[in-house]
Structure formats: C-alpha cells, structure tokens
C-alpha cells in the first residue's frame, strides 16, 4: 500500500466532526476495515461514549494500539484558514481538527496492520486496537471501562502503543515511556467574616492561608529519578471575598495540582500537605482528586522494538521522555506491563489550523508496521 492509503483514511476520519464524546461513526469505519482482515470487533458503549475493542488472534504476545477518535472543539471557525472538518491539503500539510491528535496515528496503524496481515496472515501472537471517543473529555466512560472489562475477562495485554503525538521537531525524535501522575486538591479555609475596620472581631482566612501556601510552594517534594523530573506543586486558582473592599472574607478557596513522579506516592504528598496546614492552625476542608498514577516502562522489549523501528525508518535515535500531561496510558498501564506512546509532531495540537506534514504519513505507518514485526516476528 502507498501513503495515499493512510491519507485517504485520515481524510475520512477528519471529515467526521467527532468532538468529545461523539464518535460520528469513526469507529464503525475502522471496524469495517479491520473485520475484512480478520479482526473480531466489539463495541463497548456507556454514557454516550463509544469504545472499540478489535482483536486478531488468540495467542501471546498481545500487542495493542490505543487511540481516540474524539477531538477537542475547533474554536472560532473564522480563525481557521479552512474548515476544520474539511480535510485540506496545502503547502505540504494536511489541515483539519484531529490531523495530529490523533486521527493520523489511528489511520497509520490500521494501514500498518493491513500491510502486516497481508504478508503474515498466520502471524504469531495477537494484534488489537482499543479506540475511545472519550479521551479529550472527562475520560470516565472511555479507555478506563474497556480496561476494566478486559481485566474481568482475563485478557492479558503484553505491549501497548498509544498513538499520542509525541514527536516535537521531527517525526521520531521523542517517545513517551511514562507519564507523571496528577493529584489535585481543593482547599477551603474557614474564617470569620467581618468589617475591615474591626479586624479583632473577624478572622481573615486569606491572611491565615498565605503563609501556609508560601511554605507549600517552597517545598522540594522529591528529587525525581532517572526517568522523571522532580514533583511539582502549582496553585491554579485563588478566590476569597465578596468583591467589596470593606469586608473581611469568611472563607478562602485555593485549587492546586501536583504532577508527581514515581519518587512520591499520593499518600505521601497528601500527608505532607495536611502536616503543613495543621501546623499553621488552619480550620479547613481539603478535597482530593487523583487524576492518574504515574507509570513507567523501563527499557525492554517494547521500547527496543519501537526505537529500532524509528531508527530504521528515519535514522533518528528517539529520546525516551516522561514529560507532558496525562494520557490514557495511565489506565492501560494498570493491565499492561509495557506501555509506550508514539505519534506525529505535536506543535499544532488543540490549536487553530491543526496540521500534519503529508510526508510524515507513510513513515509513521511504516514505523508502526516495523514495530509489529519486531514484536511478533522476533526469533
């Protein structure tokens, strides 16, 4: 197959305005193609979210490609140079919402699977795709419920490639072999409202909160490790008061977030925060939300297979990185021992005029195919 096979499929996918959680039959299109080459396809739907689990083969190892058909809203359409849902070729690029994040990755892997099966119809092991329409949104009815279903059924995943756009300057320069965890807190500090002229009759929660926050911001939570930078603490929102200048507020609210490595646990971070707040004598309520645990795939079979495929196709030695935000890899890592993320350049994701280089489509497909060969056909 030629690069046009990937391009044609990408265009079909971009033309479907699949803003979270609407799939707009993207997965039906994928399933139809996969069924023609022997995949057993299953839809797992909940809460308006569509998920596709497609598997070919019953043996081990099971190599999975994970991705999402949903896209973020395009924003003001008059800011785009062309309709975000009309795939447009211009100046060596393909424009459209989802071009980089991540419909090109999905199309490239589907065509890679078609090529691989055509040459190796009786290949060892199994190939599967896990596709959701709920990655860019709440992510509560998407990949996480498919992983729960697979766990209950006893389907053992061995390797997973998540098609997130990880490349930065050139296709193949960066892979993500892990991601930091995300832990958020909503801190409500209680005071006593009153008149600013009579502070002795009030208790200002802002004045009480400020030194505690100053201490939290200055803490070195850990030093990171070989794969992760140190854990970070960031205050994202502060709110207090009625809007009047003569009223001491009765409460103050701070929202904050940790991006943490495997060098710290959520329990350790929570305990240290509570220790600081208690020591400052605050009357408070603190609600926690764990967005995801960190995961890490050390160098091994999967990283070697992908890195060697990238080098064979592009000549680049890919960097293994754990930077960036969370992804669905955090759910898959619970049931799969080796997870890695790899896809096209990410410079325009979520932006107006999102695009991908046309010349990168064939190499992306070839890298995925070579990775399958390295994992399933190795002696």
From Swiss-Prot:
Which top-rank group of organisms is this from? Bacteria
Q: Which InterPro entries match?
A: Bact_exopeptidase_dim_dom, DapE_proteobac, Peptidase_M20, Peptidase_M20_dimer, Peptidase_M20A
Q: Which cofactor does it need?
A: Zn(2+); Co(2+)
**Molecular-function GO terms, alphabetical:** acetylornithine deacetylase activity; cobalt ion binding; succinyl-diaminopimelate desuccinylase activity; zinc ion binding
Paste the cofactor note.
Binds 2 Zn(2+) or Co(2+) ions per subunit.
Q: What subunit structure does UniProt give? A: Homodimer.
Extract the NCBIfam families matched here: dapE_proteo, PRK13009.1
Mind telling me what this protein is named? Succinyl-diaminopimelate desuccinylase
């Amino acid at each position: 197959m030629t690069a046009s096979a990937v391009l044609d499929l990408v265009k079909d996918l971009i033309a479907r305005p699949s803003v979270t959680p609407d799939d707009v039959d993207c997965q039906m299109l994928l399933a139809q193609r996969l069924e023609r080459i022997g995949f057993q396809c299953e839809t797992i739907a909940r809460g308006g979210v569509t998920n596709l689990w497609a598997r070919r083969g019953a043996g081990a190892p099971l190599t999975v490609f994970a991705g999402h058909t949903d896209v973020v809203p395009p924003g003001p359409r008059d800011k785009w140079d062309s309709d975000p849902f009309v795939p447009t070729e211009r100046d060596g690029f393909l424009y459209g919402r989802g071009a980089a994040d991540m419909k090109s990755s999905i199309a490239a892997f589907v065509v890679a699977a078609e090529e691989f099966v055509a040459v190796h119809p009786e290949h060892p092991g199994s190939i599967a795709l896990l596709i959701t329409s709920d990655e860019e949104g709440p992510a509560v009815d998407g990949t996480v419920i498919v992983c729960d279903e697979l766990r209950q059924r006893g389907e053992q995943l061995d390797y997973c490639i998540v098609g997130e756009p990880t490349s930065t300057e050139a296709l193949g320069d960066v892979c993500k072999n892990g991601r930091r965890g995300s832990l958020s807190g909503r801190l409500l500090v209680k005071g006593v409202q009153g008149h600013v002229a009579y502070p002795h009759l009030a208790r200002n929660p802002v004045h009480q909160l400020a030194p505690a926050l100053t201490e939290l911001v200055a803490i070195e939570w850990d030093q990171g490790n070989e794969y992760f930078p140190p854990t970070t603490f960031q205050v994202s929102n502060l709110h207090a008061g009625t809007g009047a200048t003569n009223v001491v507020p009765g409460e103050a609210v701070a929202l904050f977030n940790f991006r943490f490595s495997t060098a710290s646990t959520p329990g350790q971070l929570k305990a240290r925060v509570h220790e600081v707040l208690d020591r400052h004598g605050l009357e408070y309520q603190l609600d926690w939300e764990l967005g995801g645990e960190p995961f890490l795939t050390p160098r091994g079979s999967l990283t070697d297979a992908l890195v060697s495929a990238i080098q064979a196709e592009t000549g680049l030695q890919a960097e293994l990185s754990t930077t960036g935000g969370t992804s669905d890899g955090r759910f898959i890592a619970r049931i799969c021992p080796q997870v890695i993320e790899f896809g096209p350049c990410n410079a325009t994701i979520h932006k107006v005029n999102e695009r991908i280089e046309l010349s990168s489509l064939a190499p992306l497909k070839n890298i995925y195919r070579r990775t399958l060969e390295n994992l399933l056909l190795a002696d």
